[in-house]
Structures are given as C-alpha cells and as structure tokens.
C-alpha cells in the first residue's frame, strides 16, 4: 500500500509532522494556484514540516545570520524530500509533483509575489496545524517554526496525519506578532500578511535590483518572477526580521 510506504519514509527521514488530504479541500483557491493547475488529475495532497530549532530565534548574537542559514538548509531538505516522495509515488504507478518550500515564486494578477501553491493552506487542510494571526501555520508542538514541503499526486490516498493533533489556534486576545511587526503588515482578523509590505522591509537581495524587478513587474509579471527566482534564490535573500516567528508564544 502506497500510504504505508509514505509512512515508512517519513519515519525513516525523521519528519516530525505530516498529513494527507483529498484535493477537494483546496478547491476554493484562486485560478492558476490550484493543485490541478500544476498537476492535472491531482487527487491527494501531502504536506510535511520540519522545524527551525527554537534557540535559533533567541540568539542574542548572530541571530539573523543563523536564522538565514538554518532556513536555507531546511528548504533544501524539504525540497529534496518532496522530490523523493514524488519519486516513490511514481514508482507505484501514480503521477506526482513536488511543491517546493520557497522558490520558485510567481507574481499574480494583483502584482503580489506568491508561491505556485499556498503551502500554508496545504498544511492546514492536511491537519498538521492551523493558520495563526501572523498568517503562518502554527502547531501545538512547534509553534510558528515549522517550514513546509509538499507533494501533489494523482494517487487516491487515505486521509491521515501524524501525529494526530487538535489545534486551538491563537488566543483571542493575543496581539504579540501584530504589535511587534515594524511595518504593520499583519492583518490578524484575516490571518494574512501584506506580503509586499513585509518583503519590502525584511528582504535583502544584493544580487537583485529592486527597481528593475518593479519595472518588470509593471509590464511583464512572468519575466519579473523569473528574474527574481534567478537573482534571489536560496542564500541570495537575507531577511533582517523574523519577529512574527520568534515572538509567537503558541506551542513549543
């Protein structure tokens, strides 16, 4: 059974949280960003997460540098695992495609930088967490520190998750992330982030000209996205702010 092989691989790779859900749970995503747009005939979603260690976000010295390196190494791990899960599914006769953790990105019709699929939403529908006021996936064990990888497949897999969890979500009165955000990018009632406000403040991309990116985005969003993916991939983007993750009291 393919599900047993997925479970075995997840255990062997020490993936602490993962889940599987039917694709119908993401039927309300925007056109162009639905699972079927990437892999026609998708029936099942697989999403999994690995955390950045808590202490990385608490380091008084070299904190941003250590966060930067930790996140980049986790992205490589997650992307590699997504490819391996996809290969496992194809060995069993299904089609499967990885959904990478960060890059490549696109620019949608509103001029907003977005992933090809909403991985945070995938994490929620597969049951490994809920979306918090900071717009991130929060988990009762790892808080906001989970980084995500995912796979789409035409295999019809049983819905499951590991471990079984019941998430209460953010306390109603908590505004720690909202008040800490230096550019007021967090919309707690909508559980969303004004991503261009956030990136405009935190992202440092020494190899990418922001003025050129904005020019391309105005006239050819697809070219702008390709330029960004080539110039700001992996280590080529440095974030100076992670307060919405570091200060989140939810979970561990």
Predicted features and spans:
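Non-catalytic, usually N-terminal nucleic-acid engagement modules in DNA/RNA processing proteins
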Residues: 1-78
């Amino acid at each position: 059974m393919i599900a047993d092989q997925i479970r075995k691989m997840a255990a062997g790779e020490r993936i602490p949280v993962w889940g599987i859900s039917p694709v119908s749970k993401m039927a309300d995503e925007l056109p162009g960003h639905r699972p079927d747009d990437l892999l026609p005939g998708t029936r099942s979603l697989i999403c999994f997460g690995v955390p950045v260690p808590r202490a990385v976000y608490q380091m008084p010295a070299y904190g941003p540098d250590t966060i930067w390196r930790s996140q980049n190494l986790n992205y490589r791990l997650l992307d590699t695992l997504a490819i391996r899960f996809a290969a496992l599914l194809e060995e069993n006769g299904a089609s499967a495609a990885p959904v990478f953790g960060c890059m490549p990105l696109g620019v949608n019709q509103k001029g907003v930088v977005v992933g090809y699929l909403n991985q945070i939403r995938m994490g929620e529908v597969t049951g490994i967490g809920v979306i918090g006021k900071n717009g991130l996936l929060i988990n009762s064990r790892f808080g906001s520190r989970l980084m995500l990888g995912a796979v789409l497949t035409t295999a019809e897999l049983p819905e499951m998750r590991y471990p079984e969890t019941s998430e209460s979500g953010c306390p109603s009165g908590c505004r720690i992330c909202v008040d800490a955000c230096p550019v007021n990018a967090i919309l707690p009632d909508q559980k969303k982030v004004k991503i261009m406000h956030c990136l405009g403040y935190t992202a440092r991309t020494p190899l990418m000209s922001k003025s050129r990116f904005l020019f391309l985005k105005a006239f050819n969003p697809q070219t702008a996205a390709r330029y960004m993916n080539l110039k700001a991939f992996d280590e080529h983007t440095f974030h100076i702010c992670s307060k919405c993750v570091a200060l989140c009291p939810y979970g561990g």
